[in-house]
Amino acid sequence: MTTLYLLTDDLRLADNPALAAAARDTALAVACCIDESLFTRDKFGCQGMGPLRWQFQRESLLDLTQSLAELGHTLHILRGSPQEVYADILQNHRFDRVVRARGHEFGRITWWQNLKRRFPGIEFVEVDASTLYGVDDVSSADFSGSFSAFRRQLGEAPLRTLVPTPATLPAPVELESELIVTPEPGDISGGALAGNQHLDSYFATRAASTYKETRNQLEGESFATGFSPYLANGCLSPVQIANRLKTYEQDHGANDSTEWILFELLWREFFRWYGRQHGEKLYAFAGINGQRPLTTFYQDRFNRWRDGNTPWDIVNACMRELKQTGQLSNRGRQIVASCLVNELGLDWRCGASYFTQQLIDYDPCSNWGNWQYIAGVGADPRGGRHFNLDKQAELWDPDQQYRSRWCEGKAASTIDSFDYYGWPQDAAAP
């Protein structure tokens, strides 16, 4: 049998059940389509992928290209609409099977289903490769409720077993492709090699034993695990991290901090299956329950939030870090999201869209699910979250070092550039 293996968010050889399934046949082609629609702008003026995340993804693709070459394979990288690009391949080459990691985001599910309908004579196989649990483990879970309910429903279900890295692959099938991976140096290196090096270096320290105390910081050495960019691109799997965490606990002991790392992997898991169940509702203004929030979209307010030019210097510092680096702490994300929804009264989707563009560790289900959570249209039984911005600044930046690092000049005195009559109001100092 001849198999076409389609890469999505599984850019690695190690612990890749989808690749293992594809490698059982006699001939194999490995392909990845860069969706060109990600580089267009939506109604909020945001791209589906900005230059910082694109650089990290290019680095990840280059790393995988080199790893596959060592096994005698070419990573065929193409650009366009995934549905059209893959349909063209299937029309012009003979394949018996198409394999990919199971999709959880509505767009990926849609083009996959359309291909299945278009090519009924080909077997289409999805494999759980980006989650801790398989589809059978969560099939009875209810994703309209809380995360706590999801955890209870999982019960004692075991994590997916680690899959060995393949030593060989079937004979390669050549396709036409273009190599478009020429990354420039960045602050974070993408790819499975860099991801595994980071995994090793993190657990070589004792940072995991104090993670619960540092996780809410805005910055600092090893205050966060740093796994999220590699998870989002599939350079690391959550099972790899969970297994290394278990080894660390055996060597150094388990505590609240080590348990919290697994707890946050479970949050990611929850949002993956939440996104798969709710489909288009993940992106709906009214969320999963059809309750429209009392917010709207003001371009000027959005611009000021995006550029870090609001009356709150803690928000400004966070937004400027995000704009320049593509990174932002978990606490920082909650602060700026609460500001956009509650203080600025903006449509939560414009914030989620900007995060989509900027974040190196962008994960569709986690990003949009968390924004729904803050906006009160998602899985939060409390109906949204509203943070006191002054209190957040006092708690997490008491010495103002973070704000001093990212903010120059005085914060804006108002949330609008113009008053009711259209006259300019006070702006931030240059």
Show the residue positions of the predicted features.
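General small-molecule cofactor/ligand-binding pocket signal
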Residues: A29, T74-L78, E123-V127
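An acidic- and aromatic-residue-enriched active-site/binding cleft used to recognize and process polar
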Residues: T8-D10, C33, G80, G103-E105, ...
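Beta-rich, aromatic/charged-enriched effector core domains that present basic-aromatic interfaces
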Residues: P82-L193, Q372-I374, D390, S404
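Active-site-proximal binding-pocket segments
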Residues: F223-A412
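N-terminal beta-strand-loop-alpha-helix module at the start
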Residues: M1-G72, Q425-P430
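Glycine/tryptophan-enriched, flexible segments
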Residues: A141-N289, A393-P430
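Residues at alpha-helix caps and immediate loop-helix transition turns in enzyme cores, especially N-
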Residues: D15-A18, W111-W112, G351
